[in-house]
Amino acid sequence: MSPTTDRIAVVGGSISGLTAALMLRDAGVDVDVYERSPQPLSGFGTGIVVQPELVHYLLEQGVELDSISVPSSSMEYVDALTGERVGSVPADWRFTSYDSIYGGLYELFGPERYHTSKCLVGLSQDSETVQMRFSDGTKAEANWVIGADGGASVVRKRLLGIEPTYAGYVTWRGVLQPGEVADDVWNYFNDKFTYGLLDDGHLIAYPIPGRENAESPRLNFQWYWNVAEGPDLDELMTDVRGIRLPTSVHNNSLNPHNLRQFHSKGESLFKPFRDLVLNASSPFVTVVADATVDRMVHGRVLLIGDAAVTPRPHAAAGGAKACDDARTLAEVFTKNHDLRGSLQSWETRQLQQGHAYLNKVKKMASRLQHGGSFEPGNPAFAFGLPKVDEPSVVTNS
C-alpha cells in the first residue's frame, strides 16, 4: 500500500485535526495544519471521558494511559439540591483532560508545520487544488483540505452556510486544584463520575489528571443551565466590553453580574456541588449547540469531527467521534485504492455514526435538562459511540 502523493492541508489544529495530520504524516503524506488561534490551544483544562477512539493514536505511540488519565470505579446519581442518592452503578471509566490529549498530540506533531494565527476567510477549489485565504493576508494551496475547525466551523460555513443551532441551554465549566475544596468534598467526587440531577438542568463532576503530569488530580465540573434564546441569553453571553460573544465567555471576560448570578444560584445546591461552584477560580460559560450535514465530502474539501456533526456532550464521545473521523479518513488517503470510491464509503459510514450519536445525545438532553427520568445504568444513555461497520476500501481491481 502506498500513500497519496497529494499535499493535504488541515484547517483546525485541535484534537481531530492533529490526529488526522499525524496519521497522514506518519504514512509519508505532505501535510500542514492551519489554526486560527495565535498560540497552541489550552482548552482551559476541561475534562474528557476516555474512549478508545480518543486515545488510539497516543497509545500506538507508546504513551502510557496512566500518564494521561485517572481511573474511576462507579457512576453516582444524586439529587443536586438535597444530596439524596438516586442510584449507583459500577463503572471503570477513565478521565482525561483536553490539555493532556491535545498536549500529547501537539508535542508529537511539533510547531514547524503547525501554522497559528491562520483564520480562514476564503476557500475555493478547482479540479486539482484548493485555495485558502487567511485574515492575515496570506494564502495557501493544497490538493485536499480537511476541515477540522470545530463546532463553529468556518470551512462548513463557507461550503454550506450552516452554523450551529442553539440547543436551549448553556454549560458553566470549572476546574479545581487540590486544596481549593475541603478533603470531604474532594473525596465525595474522587474515583467516580457524578450526576447531579435537577428539575431544571443538571451537573456532572469527575476527577481529571493534574497539569503537565502532576501527581495530584484536579476536579472538573459542568453545570447545565436552561437559558431562553433572546435577551436572557444575550445578557449572559455579553462580556465586560459589551460585546455579545457567539460561543464562550471566558473567566477574565465575564460580566461581574453574570458571575454573581452563577455564585448565587450555586448557594442552593447540595454542599459538595455548592463548594465546587463557589470555589472554582476560573469558571466560564459556553453555549450548547447542534449542527449537522448531509455530506462530508465536498469535492476536494472534507469535513470531520464537530465541523461535520456537532453533538451535545452528554454521551462523552464527541472527541472520540472526531478522532474516529480523522483516523478512518487518514486510512483512506494512505492506501492504494480507488480514492473517490473509498471516500464515498467513508462518508456513508461516518455520517451514519455521527447522525446516530447526535440523536442519542438529544434524547439524553431531553431528560437531563427537564427533570425527566434518567435511570442509573440505562444502556440507552451509556457513554460511547454507536456501533457501525468500518468503512470499506474500494480497490481498482
From Swiss-Prot:
Q: How does activity depend on pH?
A: Optimum pH is 8.0.
Instruction: Give me any GO biological process, just one.
Output: nicotine catabolic process
Q: Which cofactor does it need?
A: FAD
InterPro entries assigned: DHP_3-monooxygenase, DhpH_subs-bd, FAD-bd, FAD/NAD-bd_sf
Enzyme class per UniProt: oxidoreductase
Q: Which superkingdom does the taxonomy of this entry point to?
A: Bacteria
Q: How does activity depend on temperature?
A: Optimum temperature is 20 degrees Celsius.
Membrane spanning residue stretches: none
Q: How does it assemble?
A: Homodimer.
Outline what the protein does.
Catalyzes the conversion of 2,6-dihydroxypyridine into 2,3,6-trihydroxypyridine in the nicotine degradation pathway.
What protein name is recorded for this chain?
2,6-dihydroxypyridine 3-monooxygenase
Q: Which gene encodes it?
A: dhpH
